[in-house]
Amino acid sequence: IFRSAAALNMDAVLLTSACSDPLYRRAIRVSMGTVFQVPWTYIENKNVSWPQGGMDLLHEYGFKTVAMALRNDSVRIDDEKLHEEEKLAIILGTEGDGLAAETMADCDYTVKIPMSHGVDSLNVAAASAVAFW
């Protein structure tokens, strides 16, 4: 995810406590060192919890939030209204369980990547690269 964020000019990566440590030796190696190129921070602290506090903070700072999720009400990632938004925060879940229902409910948009018949999902690294593009 960090390598894609660096390659595709993302402004920053926000992490929760559930994320892997980006400074772990293997994470640095897998990211090809891009963890040192992209600004990042944890969105949680003693005053802000995830998901509710973090989502509130993003909205307070003027971000529209985008949940990457396969749902019937999801808009396509190439939907024009997404391109019109000035500040987007892309919310990614785990590969197995995805995002919690409460997190998706707090997002301004739920977005899907159109895929060929018979393929229903991408891993989170591939999906993030498509979303960042």
For each predicted feature, which ranges?
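RNA substrate-binding interface of SAM-dependent RNA methyltransferases
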Residues: 1-73
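Generic low-complexity, intrinsically disordered sequence content enriched
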Residues: 59-62, 86, 126
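Structured adenosyl-cofactor binding patch, chiefly the S-adenosyl-L-methionine
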Residues: 4-8, 19-36, 101-133
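Active-site/ligand-binding-proximal alpha/beta "capping" segment
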Residues: 66-119
